[in-house]
Amino acid sequence: MKSLSMRNRCVIGFTLFSMFFGAGNLIFPPLLGAEAGSSTIPAMVGMLLTAVVLPALAVISVAKHDGLKNLAGSIHPAFATVYAVLIHLLIGPFVAIPRTASTSFEMAVVPFLSDGFSAESLLIMRCIYSFTFFVIATIVALKPTRLKDLLGKVMTPILLILIAVIFVGVVVKFPTVVRQADASYKGHALQHGFVTGYQTMDILAAFNFGAVIAMNIEAFGVKNRKGVAKETILAGIGAGILLCIVYSATAYIGVLCSSKVGNVENGTQILTYAVHACFGIYGKVLIGIIFFIACFNVCVGLLCCCSAYFHELVPKISYFKWLLVFSVFSFVISCAGLNAILNVSLPILKVMCPIAIALTFYGLVRHKRQ
């Protein structure tokens, strides 16, 4: 049974990491660190359980059953189809894909626009940016088996280096002053961190990514089913380790900056303050590049996953046509109506996450018994 070399395993692990690590993953840890203060360690343990361990277990569970269809289908074929369709639509074109464009626009473009921009001009700029963003993402997503070449070998290393630069800059710039935890964290930091990690909803994304990661593993020459499952599991473990490191580093940034920024609403404000304090005007460029890369990686990964799944579900419609449909739909939503879609979809996502957790452990237990 052929296996990947250590170098290629790292590439696949980087690729999976990049598909998980979007804007939300950048925002939650710094806010947790700032609010948890002296209780950051137990809070981070809670967050890592739901934001890293559960998604990694979901990847393993899906890999052991050779796909979500087989895993969910072991309960009932109708459940497999309905649940998978809902996951791909909600984590894909209805929510996450359009949000990658709108979030990266807010962080990579808006800070450089003058205050005199009218609402109409800003909307036009947003549409132009989103159109360009999705054209590039669609071109990259045309070849899902080559994601490893761009995301794994280029984009993720750049992203990790830039995050490391910010981390080192903050550690050098700010004294180690840890303030007391906010009232919401005192006495139950672990539980609060658990809920924070739950909000990333990466366990749902984990069900999506297995097929595309398997394609990239097969492109390296591993064709055996057991071999692909083994390498997918290793990729899940590798991506999980990377996520733990990055989450811990960005949470520590929040801890160090908490005494300076005061009360904040989200982690974006903390990161923006940190890079500006450390790097001045260049900090805007740095944080803009980081958010663009993170959002672009997730966008491409989700476009590939959703298009591949629906092509498998409805073979008469080609992968390319599904890709165009999801790209155009996501472009429209990113320009207008995203908040309304989020208001409708987020309650549904919160219902689906417990089902995903139960399905993950069901798959692990079922496979062990077999």
Where on the chain are the PLM-derived regions?
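Hydrophobic alpha-helical segments and their helix-loop junctions in multi-pass secondary transporters
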Residues: 93, 97, 160-186, 203-204, ...
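Hydrophobic, membrane-embedded alpha-helices of multi-pass small-molecule transporters
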Residues: 11-21, 169-176, 185-250, 288-294, ...
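Helix-loop-helix connectors at the membrane interface of multi-pass transporters/channels
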Residues: 32, 102-124, 218-222, 299-325
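Extracellular/periplasmic helix-exit of transmembrane alpha-helices
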Residues: 241-270
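Membrane-interface loop-to-helix entry segments
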Residues: 141-170, 345-358, 370
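Select transmembrane alpha-helical segments in multipass membrane proteins
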Residues: 5-16, 41, 77-91, 125-131, ...
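Loop-to-transmembrane helix boundary motifs in multi-pass membrane proteins
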Residues: 238, 242, 296, 310-339
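Membrane helical hairpin/interfacial module
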Residues: 36-126, 131, 135
